[in-house]
Structures are given as structure tokens and as C-alpha cells.
């Protein structure tokens, strides 16, 4: 009845779903009590206020249909008649719209005409604010401004050194002018010696200061690089599990590797070229003093460089985007192939995999070649402008010298000064590919750094967990347009109780434990531990007090001891050995040559499947968690290993709440209570013998299948 009542207020339903999309839990009844004061449903103003109270940033806008592909989705399409719906995706190629019908509780694909018929032009855009956990500010080029301010003293020193370098660059042409116009004409050898010594001193200072500037600048940018790299990794590990499940491993690795492009840009010559370019106005003033006509030629060339860059840049950026996509595909395929090498060899599909790799590699090389060709065309265009300006200046300068308006020394000095102006422009133009590449890299890296971290609405870090668990009216799906996984699940688990959960594949058993670990926030309802809502709890605090053993566990390339004591490297050896004995792992570990110091290899490749599983069980037990989850933990074990675990099960379960998920019913038959799930709902519960008495029940049916 409560769900039906909520379904009548589509605004509240939409708010619940959008909050869940951003990993924020809410109590619909509490929102209704606070903001639906007249009982007629949430108005536009109250909806925005309710979103703000949930740490969501909501904005009401009016947007034409033709521009909907530019907005951040999913968004709420607000209707004056109250029949709101969610806009999930816009397919501009086929003029189709993926929406979510809140009344029918199902996704819909609408054609252009169908969407125009129901769209009234009003949208509510929803994004998550920075959480209490701490979310990085939006990552783009502006991210580097605070970093530059932080090291402003060092950058100020670099600026001062640059000023002196420009002064030296200004003095050198004057020396040449004096030599050409004075020394050679008057045969002044003593003056020549003085100028030569002075020029040598200037050159030495210029070399030393230039090297010093490069060193100081590289040192500062390296610090920024370290900060960015550290924040990137911390942020990556703070992202919700859904981020990784929705992306290929290779894609994520490829985005993280974009940090190398930013690093090369920061430590390269591009930024020092920008500093040199800033001093060009001083050179222009001196050049104007020599010859306004020649200076106008130089000034006239600058728009040519800019226009050429404007012409090349969009094409180059598109090709760089394509190159990145091909590279990410290759990275993902390579990671997938290496990870699945046992399957590839077992099925003898290496030729097919090689053929796929060859095609993808050829596509990447072709894309990379197109980038190189376009970059070469861009650089040659810059060279053409430079050579053309040089020819014009030579012709015009010679005319000015012949007419007596300019001396030979002044012409030489002018050309040297113009070289100081044009050189950083040319370097920047030639490095334009790097500018474009680093822009792509910042965007790609922003996909990681701008993704919201796991959020919680309070600072709830409770004392040690006791073990009471409660699922209240849980409704959950992994995506707004995905099917419902859990539907109106209610379950109470008492402290110290051993619960078995069984059911067909896809019935929602593992999803229930993922909600308990707060990997996801339910769309509706609450998950409570000791009466406290997990939506308000710090995920790290929670997970440190829950032990989890999965069917496929990952071991790190470290020693057995380090893997068991992963959460506390300084843990006493006695605790490690005790946990290993409980898990039935101590005997086989003792037989190894290095014992607990044996390196297990990448993902535990040096051990058998049963040995890996027992070490994973020991790792889950070593912290003495009050809640223990076995998700098909014994299904990969041989019967002897499983027998050892089951013998110790009474000790393992003592003093803690245990949830056993299994397809093999023999694993759960001694549980205090067995929960039977089907299509996201609890259909039966009771002890083993009680469930068998219901011959028409699902548990009895599964039991009969296993007996046969």
C-alpha cells in the first residue's frame, strides 16, 4: 500500500531513483513529511528543496529538444500535469529517446514524434555535490591554478629568471649591431675585444640561468605531478563499485595512463615557451624603434599562425579522440587476453584472438598515422609562414638599407630580435599537438576524477558492531533502466544467527550481501545494522567489521602472511596462524618451503584453487569480524578441503552473525534458518527439515534435484 501511494507521486519516485543513481539513500516517507505539506505531491519548488537536502545539486531549466543531447543525463522531465518521467539517453543518430516511465515502472524507447508529444520543454538536471568524504573539485585545466598558487614562490623565482634571460636576449643583438656599425667601420680592435668578452659573459650567464630555470621549473612541476598522481589513485580507490562494473578494466587503465601525457606536458618546454612569449611586447617596442615597416610584417604574421592553428585544431582533436578510443580498445583487449590466458590455451583459440588483435592493432596504427600526418601538415604550414616572413623581411630590409633608412647592423639586430619573438610562437605552434593531446588527456582523466566517490549523508562511525541485521522494504535495481533485482524484501537477522540463503541463479542472493556491504544504496527501503541505517555510515568503517569470502577471491602478489594480514600488516603472527588453522590452511602452509613467507604469485597463481580459497577464508577471519559472509565460498573447494572447513564451522560461526550463500544445499542444512529466494523475493524460510516438509516448495524441489 505504501509503495502504491508513493507511486502516485511521480516526483517523489523520480527523486528516489535519481538519489539512488548518485549513491544517496533517502527515506521517501521522511521526504514526504518534510516537503509534501499539502499531501498533493511534491511541487517544483519543494522538489528542488528536497534534492538540496539530500546533498544533490538540482537545477530547473528549459531546453529545446534539439539541444537535449548536450545535457547531463539522467534528468527529470518535469510535466505540469504531474506525469513526470526520466530521460536516460538521447540517440541523435536514430532520433530515439530512452526514457523511464515512472507510472509503469519500466524503461521505454520513444521515437521523435512520440517524445515531442509528451515533452513540455522543462528539465531538472541533477548532479551530486561534494560529499563529506571529500570529492575533488571538477578536474580540468583550472585544477592546476591552486597548485600553481601553492608553489607561487618558486614560480615567481622562475619568472624573475625569465626576465633576466629576456634582458640578455635583448642585449645580444645590440652587441652585434655595435660590431657591424662601429667596430668594422672604425677598425676598433680594443672595442671588439671588450664586446667579445662582454658577449661571452652574457652567454655564460644565459646558459646558467636557462639551465637553472629548467631545473627549478621541472622540480616544481614534478611536485604537482606527484600530487595529481597521489590524488588520482586515492580517488580511484574511493569510487563506488558501480564505476568499475560499468567500465572495462582496460578503459580505466588507459585513462589513468593519460597522466603520462600531462606529466610530459608539464615538464616539457611548452610552459617555458609561454613565459618567453609573454615578454614579446618588450621586443616589439625595440623592433618598432628600429623599423616600423619590418615590425608590421612580423605582427602581420601572427594572425596567420593563429588562423592556421584554428583550422588544424578541430580536425586534430577529432583524430586524437579516435586514436585514444583505439588505444583504449587495445588496452582492454590485452588485459582481457592476459587475464583469460588459461581459457585461451585450453580452447586453442589463440589464432582467433591473434586475428582480432591484428585487426585492432592495424586500426590503431592507421589512426595514429592519420594524427602524425595531420600534425606534420600543421608543422610544415608553420614553417611555410616563417620562411615567407623571412623572405619578405630580407627583401624589405635590403631596400631600407640601400635607401639609407636602416644600417646593416640594425638590420642584423632586428632579425635577431624578431627571431626571439617568433621562436616561442613557432615552438608553441609545433607543440600544438601536445596542447591538443593534453586537452584530451585532461578530459579522459576527468572521467575518473570527476566521478563522485562513495558518499554518505552523515558521519556515522559506530563502535564495534554487534551483528543485528535488518532489511526493510528493500527494492533495488543496478541501473534506472535495468530490471528489478530485489523487490520488497524484508528480513530480520539476529545477532549470532547463522543464516543460509539459497535460490536459483539471478534470484538476488549476492545482491543482498552487496547492499549489506554498502556497495550500493537501495532504491527504496533501508538496510540496518544494530538499528543504524547504513546509508548514513562510513563505508570504510563498515567494511572493516565485515568479513567476506567470495567464490573467486583475489590474492595479491605478496607472501601468504601479508595476504592474510592485509588489513593490518603489523598483526601478530599468532593471530595469523590462528586464522589459518580455523580456515584449514595451516597444514598445507607449513609444508611449503618458505611457510608463511611464500610468495603466492599474481592473483595467487602459485597455489591451487582450494589453497587460495582457504587463505581467503583466513583473511576474512583474522580481524574477528562480527558479521561474516560466505558467498559460494566452498563451492570451489575439493571435498577434503570443504570437510576441513565444515569441521571448523562451529568455531568459525561462534560469536558472530554468519550469512551462507550456496547452491549446494548441504552447505546450509545446519544453518539456524534458511532463506529461499526467487526472482528477487523471499518465498520461503525456516530450518532444513521444516522446508522439506513443504513438498511443493522451491527448497524441496532444489533438494530433490541435488539428490537425483
Swiss-Prot record:
Question: How would you classify this enzyme at the top EC level?
Answer: translocase
Occurrences of domain ABC transmembrane type-1 (ranges): 155-437
Question: Cross-referenced Pfam families, in alphabetical order?
Answer: ABC_membrane (PF00664), ABC_tran (PF00005), Peptidase_C39 (PF03412)
Q: Where are the transmembrane segments?
A: 159-179, 192-212, 270-290, 296-316, 389-409
GO cellular component terms, A-Z: plasma membrane; type I protein secretion system complex
Q: What is its main location?
A: membrane
Q: Which ranges carry the ABC transporter domain?
A: 469-704
Q: Which residues form a coiled coil?
A: none
**How the protein sits in the membrane?**
Multi-pass membrane protein
Q: Which family does it belong to?
A: Belongs to the ABC transporter superfamily. Protein-1 exporter (TC 3.A.1.109) family.
Domain statement? In LktB the peptidase C39 domain, the ATP-binding domain (NBD) and the transmembrane domain (TMD) are fused.
The protein, known as: Leukotoxin translocation ATP-binding protein LktB
Point out the gene that encodes the protein.
Answer: lktB
